[in-house]
Amino acid sequence: MAPSALPERSEPVTRAELEAFKLDRLRGLLRDVLPQNAFCAAKLSRVAADRLASLDDLAEWPFTFKEELVAAASNGLPGNLTWPPERYVRFHQTSGTHGRPLPVFDTRDDWAWWMECWRVILDRGGVTPDDRVLVASSFGPYAGFWSGFEAVIDRGGLAISAGGMPSLGRLQLARSLAATVLMATPSYALHLAEVAEEHKIDLAALPVRLVIVMGEPGGSIP
């Protein structure tokens, strides 16, 4: 089995080492997925995915679009499952802002991957066990906020659920609990700022030092 991460060492990883690691991991993933996943097998049937020679070969691979995944889903199940349904332990779905929501099933290993991704995000933001993180979400089936909330708990910080609260209530909760980090979508973070202005709440006086945004393209724009 291919290693799940590059070995830790003091000197930087070279580009060649990184690409070799990625290729090895991808080959292992394909060996597991293609025999079990009819959607992926059909999608990659014309590119000899089982004979991937280099990462450059990926330039010839077809894109997979969200519309295809939504169309393949039926009876609440994704159309691209690799394992039997009983192996999955978590259900989430996309927000449905643009069309029908896309169901997402995760195994325990999948969820561990989510947590590893969030570990990197929290590291980059300098989030520590001393932080108090207000998660401004309705806590419906949207995966992003559930994963972020659990990652804060794993970090040892205080994860503050603000589900089911009006925007003003969330601002008041952030103030009363001295939240140091806000987690929200970009558009909702801007909406909170507008509500604060309407109710004459001085955002600069709040202890929030970091805003982590997700779920919309704005989160990737510096």
Where are these regions (language model features)?
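Active-site glycine/GP-rich loop and adjacent strand/helix microenvironment
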Residues: M1-D32, R155-P222
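Nucleotide 5′-phosphate-binding alpha/beta core
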Residues: M1-Q93, G99-E116, D123-R124
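Short, flexible loop segments at the rims of nucleotide/cofactor-binding pockets, characterized by
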Residues: D110-W111, S137, L158-A162
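Residue-level signal for inorganic ion chemistry
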Residues: V33, T94, V133, L182
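Short glycine-enriched loops at secondary-structure junctions
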Residues: Y88, W111, S138-P141, S187
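Conserved ATP-dependent adenylate/AMP-binding module captured primarily in the ANL superfamily
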Residues: M115-R132, P166-A179
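Conserved AMP-binding loop of ANL adenylate-forming enzymes
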Residues: D123-R155
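Short acidic, glycine/Ser/Thr-rich loop/turn "cap" segments at secondary-structure junctions
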Residues: G99-D106, D130-S137, A174
